[in-house]
Amino acid sequence: MWNELKSAKEINKEKPFYINILAKDVFEIDTDETILVQGIIDLYYINKNNELILVDFKTDYIKEGEEDKLVKKYNKQLEIYKKALESSLKRKVVHTYIFSMQLNKLIEL
């Protein structure tokens, strides 16, 4: 990832966002109501191939081989980030990653 960032066309860090989404997409409830979600996207960039890449940094303590625990824990959060980014930029996120600080490893969702 670091090498790809060096040649990126555009890099954005710690960007706040707001998005209206269905409450049932966040909580296990049966409703068609929408809620306003706000957050901060750690990193997104446009690589040299003009692809939109989303990265979220996590500091959770996990052991090598337990990467799936991070994916399970944060998948819903990153889906919301992805929707927010795609909605605001009007383009598709090609890759979504968690960067585990503990493992110093990029994990694709």
Task: Locate predicted features.
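Structural signature of nuclease core domains in nucleic-acid processing machines
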Residues: M1-L109
